[in-house]
Amino acid sequence: MTYNPRIGGFTHVKQASFDVHVKRGEAQPRTSFAQQIKRIFSKIGETLGQLFRHRAPDSAPGRVRLQGVRYVGSYRPTGDAKQAIRHFVDEAVKQVAHTRTPEIRQDAEFGRQVYEATLCAIFSEAKDRFCMDPATRAGNVRPAFIEALGDAARATGLPGADKQGVFTPSGAGTNPLYTEIRLRADTLMGAELAARPEYRELQPYARQQAIDLVANALPAERSNTLVEFRQTVQTLEATYRRAAQDASRDEKGATNAADGA
């Protein structure tokens, strides 16, 4: 698979484009992890491109009428925007699972790449979520969290490198299946619903669905590693957030004491 910017994803290439190329009995060097991630997006993009090009006009969902509290098309009407949006997200998850689950199970190389990309996405999202939160500024908590997060990522066997003593995966970024789910959901629900704040509120749910999709498609060992890594990351976040809160209280207490002196 190769990345096609015109469709924002993948197009098919011959099997020889994967990491190991056989020529006269000799294995060639592995491609970079970043290139592997691009191939995953390329594979996904090809399917999305076909979806957008070949969808019949009468198969598209009807226009959403928010004022009439009725969502028409092939979906059950509802007056709750969040419920309707979640329905479209769930439908997108089903469609992506139908396409990708067999590929992950049958294509070992693609399955490995999706597995590693999902681990990297969990790492990257946790790092951004923690470090961009003003509540974690106090003390020296952020560097300590990143170091602990890197150690957890290293323990999964992800490829990466130490940068100033902190392990960083080579392919940190967005879960490619989450991207596919979101693009499909956008297409199903239409621009009016996709612009609503309820859709943004449901993105953590969509991300979790993407992780669950991958975990359910993987062999047991990798599935367990994926689930355990996510649980470890959640524990680390909770632990270091408490540390940041304690540090913030200590700083405020010291400031108040100095003012009263």
Swiss-Prot record:
Role of this protein: Activator for both CDC42 and RAC1 by directly interacting with these Rho GTPases and acting as a guanine nucleotide exchange factor (GEF). This activation results in actin cytoskeleton rearrangements and stimulates membrane ruffling, thus promoting bacterial entry into non-phagocytic cells.
Taxonomic lineage from the root: Bacteria, Pseudomonadati, Pseudomonadota, Betaproteobacteria, Burkholderiales
InterPro entries assigned: SopE, SopE-like_GEF_dom_sf, SopE_GEF_dom
Gene3D superfamilies per record: SopE-like, GEF domain
Keywords for the protein's UniProt record, in alphabetical order: GTPase activation, Guanine-nucleotide releasing factor, Secreted, Virulence
Cellular component terms per the entry's GO annotation: extracellular region
GO terms classed as biological process: actin cytoskeleton organization
The protein, known as: Guanine nucleotide exchange factor BopE
Compartments it resides in: Secreted
Subunit note: Monomer. Interacts with human CDC42.
UniProt main location, coarse: secreted
SUPFAM superfamilies, sorted: SopE-like GEF domain
Statement: the UniProt record of this protein carries the keyword Secreted: yes
One MF term in the entry's GO annotations: guanyl-nucleotide exchange factor activity
Protein family: Belongs to the GEF (guanine exchange factor) SopE family.
Superkingdom per UniProt: Bacteria
